[in-house]
Swiss-Prot record:
PROSITE patterns: METHYLGLYOXAL_SYNTH, MGS. One of its GO terms (molecular function) is methylglyoxal synthase activity. This is Methylglyoxal synthase. It comes from Teredinibacter turnerae (strain ATCC 39867 / T7901). GO terms for biological process: methylglyoxal biosynthetic process. The keyword Lyase applies. Gene3D superfamilies: Methylglyoxal synthase-like domain.
Amino acid sequence: MEKKVQKLHDKKNIALVAHDNMKDPLCKWAKKHSFKLSAHQLYATGTTGHKLEEATGLSIRKCVSGPLGGDQQIGAKISEGEIDILIFFWDPFEPMPHDPDVKALLRIAAVWNIPVACNPASADFIISSQYINEEYERLVPDYDAYIAKRLG
């Protein structure tokens, strides 16, 4: 697939998602980094978003809860260019009834070349990156070229 450059602004759109057993670690992480996070637009799935607002006092744009379609809503926002970074604390020890949704979310993040953190250590690396508060150019699929080629 052909690629094109997409410019990210210094204020990023960051999605925060966590499975049930990982909501507290995500809230703890977000509270620790609330100053840096406050410079960005934050999104979350439903329950996680409410817990994050309570823990940090930050404003969060909330989708529905993950098992009710929130993971898919976040994925749609990624494919529409509305999410720049995904912080997704998932529990590797718990079977997930909505596992296909989780796999789809991670696949979409990979397709659209967005940074993904799956635990506090990887999230620390992203939030402390020099690019978090700077403009950044990334390669994304060129959908217009894709359609033109398909309709050719």
